[in-house]
Amino acid sequence: MALARPWLIATAAAASAALTLAPAVSANAQAATGTGRATVAGLASRACPPAGFAVSFSDSLDKLVYHGVELGGLSSLAYDARSAAWVSAVDNHGTDPARIWFFRNLAHPTVTRDPLVLRKPDGTAYDGTNSDNEGLAVLPDGDYLVSSETEPSIRIYGRDGVQKASLPIPARFAVTGTTPDGQATSNATLEGLTISRSGREIISSMEGALSGDVSASGDATFHRFLVYDQARTGTWQLTRQIAYRTETGNRIPEVQAYGKDSLLVEEAAFSTTAGNSEELYAVKNADSAPDVSNVANLSQAPAGDVVSKKLVANLVQCPTLGAPSRETQANPLLDNYEGMTIVGGPGLAAVSLISDDNFSATQFTRVLNLLVKLP
């Protein structure tokens, strides 16, 4: 992850302008995006320990129908400078076409246009029967990068929504039973997706563990990240794998790059008695992390093969901000947050998350805006 390039600077500047937060803490939002000098001193009552602060939330997208199309199932969040809009992909919804939605202002999101339908090279639309689009990033040339849990796959789509290419995925990452070498659990494959600040490195994270990385005692906390570098020809090549360990019982819905070579990882879990839980962990020096591509079983690997992480925000401990809930939650502000984006960092950064309502009457499509001090 090299230093930022002009395309990213322009994107970050536009994203900063688009990230309008609640008036009560607008100065702190400016600080997070480099447009003001305020500090977080006045946000103690909004703490999400140890280093996060809840700024605002919005349910304005919840159960929205736009030009006859139901919005829901949003599982990713990225900024598209060419559209001057935030973008989010629908994971899957039966035979409905796979779509990317566009909206502005994360404090009070408003849809800006009809969604973009994602299509195969022959022009036929992907749908919920053959894609489960969980990750989304915008490449420097404006193409859309989308990860799907179905196979899994990582595909590149043009701005017309037509697939242009796909990235190579190691055989063992296929869902168990779909191929002879597959070790992934269905609906727990390539969920997180991000592009480095340089625009030349892609990272995708596994939501769950490969069966080959589970210990004899059943420890399934070891996850793999795939790292791709861009060749001089412009094509993307898989260059290495990174090992990451979650807290027991957690999955990884999202990963986002920030700074020179740092990552922010979202860990999450759900229980019927406590609802959703989410924590954000920072990983520094990802570029120097050991390559574990040839490690057969991460649970038997030396501790040094697994990246170190630091808890920066426990969202269960955020203030509720008066948020409503339709199901049992230890904190009603929480829902099924699966998409995440960062403006700024290291230091004080604006972090926003979006929840996947699964097109369910008991869940929200909610945007949560935070300030987080990132190492």
Residues covered by each model-derived region:
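Secretory targeting and sorting signals
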Residues: 1-31
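Sequence/structural signature of beta-propeller domains
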Residues: 2-4, 30-375
